[in-house]
Amino acid sequence: MWDDVKVIESSDANVRKYVFSKSNAVAEAVLYKYPTYDKRTVICCSTQSGCPVGCRFCGAGDNFVRSLRWDEIVSQPVRLLEDTGVDPANMERLQIMFMSMGEPLLNLKELIPALRELYARFPNAALLISTIGPQTDFGPVLSISKEIPTIGLQFSIHESTDERRDKLIPFIKKSSLKRISLLG
């Protein structure tokens, strides 16, 4: 799947960053333990290699390469969970979040089958989609959330007005705060 995986561990060993790479893509995922993996495990994984959104505060910036395939998305939490040494079924709290590199809702075609596969493998996991709220049809997200009861949608707002938000997130085709509040 991936040609190379680099792992960087924090000095206190509570956080591990993974960089997955191959000739035409890079993805990042992060593994957190609170305070142990069997108590609470949180994974943040990528849905795209780079990101087309261009948030001013994000390291992915405007360096968009491509959207990841569903199996490339799934392979990230699978690898991270293997590295915990704990059976995911025995974790008191497991969260898999789509919020590392890329805008998940700009890759719904691949995200939805990834969500189905992850739910089949880890039915106890909360599957959380973090989004800036691009102007898109939210129907597929609402539909899959009825099929998979552990899915959650969270909006990355970052600012309290559309004007200030536009400076921080220059992506033109994002939903207004009013639309997000109506979806929310």
Please report, for each region that a protein language model flagged, where it lies by residue.
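Non-catalytic surface loops within mature trypsin-like serine protease
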Residues: 22, 33, 49, 157-159
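Residues in well-ordered beta-strands of folded domains
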Residues: 19, 30, 46, 97-99, ...
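Short secondary-structure boundary segments
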Residues: 5-12, 17, 73, 95-104
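Short linear Ser/Thr-Pro motifs
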Residues: 8-11, 46-47, 130-131, 156
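Canonical Radical SAM [4Fe-4S] cluster-binding loop centered on the CxxxCxxC motif
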Residues: 33-79
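Basic side chains
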Residues: 17, 76, 164-165
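Flexible, acidic/Gly-rich N-terminal and inter-domain linker regions that tether
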Residues: 1-41
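Conserved AdoMet/S-adenosylmethionine-binding subsite of the radical SAM
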Residues: 81-184
